Amino acid sequence: MRWSNFFLKKSCYFSINRHISITDSDSDHNANAMRQSKELLERINKVVRHIEQAIDREMSLDELATIACFSPFHFQRIFKEIIGETPKQFIKRLRLEEAARLIAFHPDRNILSVAFQVGFQSLEVFSRAFKDYYSISPDTYRKSSESERFRITQMPYTQLQTGEKPVLDVVSLKPMQDFDDLSIEIVTRPPIQCVYLKTTLQSPKMVDESFKSIKQWSHIRDLPGSDATPFGVIKDYPIFTALDKCRFFTCIAVDNPAKISGIVNHFAISSKKYATFTIEGGIADIVEAAKFLVHAWMPGSGYEIVLEPVILIPLKDPTATPFKENSWQTHIPIQPEGRLY
């Protein structure tokens, strides 16, 4: 049985690399199937959250299967069907992409400390895994130019892709001088409680539909704060992660999150300091402006990037304005330079 077949309804989309519906089914059979599919998603979502929070330590298949209340065999099969990767592949990719980001943004950091931070128990094991994945050693990657590092981190995807490229084309990004008039401010945002749907940056249309879906979901349940405008959270940096794997949350801030299950999750964002700018356009435009921030504004600012989710606040209603046509107040997490992790 392919569990994703349950999720192909017409009303709206949700993605963990899939389109699925949150509408009522037209028959008792379909309603039962939908309930089962939501329960599966709830279990797998719980495992994904656990993996993200425990990325710095070893996790066995038995441990993850227990969290999902499946046998190891059934858990591995269902996880791959929903996520598109086995648990081992998913964990390895998250760890290595996190390591690549850490090395790229903080090249002075000790490679061994990076290995430990992303869950590897020795430098030898980490170096071998990094080279197997990126075809280059961590130390050589660190010494590479920025453009070469971007090429390297996208290689696992471009080598496998036979059709449309799922990665961001960094070669075509605008020159940094095009952003000389970009206004960058430092702000501290208060903590936020929100509910969200998870999609990816592979398709702007999927993102647009996900904004509509989370708005509809919260409105139907009349959640406190559900009249607020949805906003976005980028969980993975598109330069380092293929767009079809780059997790994007469409969120609604709520005063008191109700009990949630299935395709909708709860997300708490703590109070943080951000470097903020406003840019019009799609994900490539946002990344172009972020590159300017990193290379032109960050040096000498006394701050450095924190590798945590980026918040996108739309200036126009994202349920009525396509992603690429909106203007986004972009919040990139920062901390005082040299602060210990």
Q: Which residues does each predicted region cover?
A:
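Basic, amphipathic alpha-helical hairpins
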Residues: K46-M59, R101-N110, F130
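A solvent-exposed interaction/effector surface
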Residues: Q89, E97, A104-F105, L112, ...
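N-terminal positioning helix adjacent to the helix-turn-helix/winged-helix DNA-binding module
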Residues: E39-V47, I83, K92-R95, P107
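Conserved hydrophobic/aromatic pocket- or pore-lining residues that grip, position, or stack substrates
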Residues: I51, F75, L293
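Basic/polar phosphate-binding segments, predominantly the helix-turn-helix DNA-binding elements
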Residues: D26-R35, E58-I91, A115-S137
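Compositionally biased, intrinsically disordered low-complexity segments enriched
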Residues: S15, S21-H29
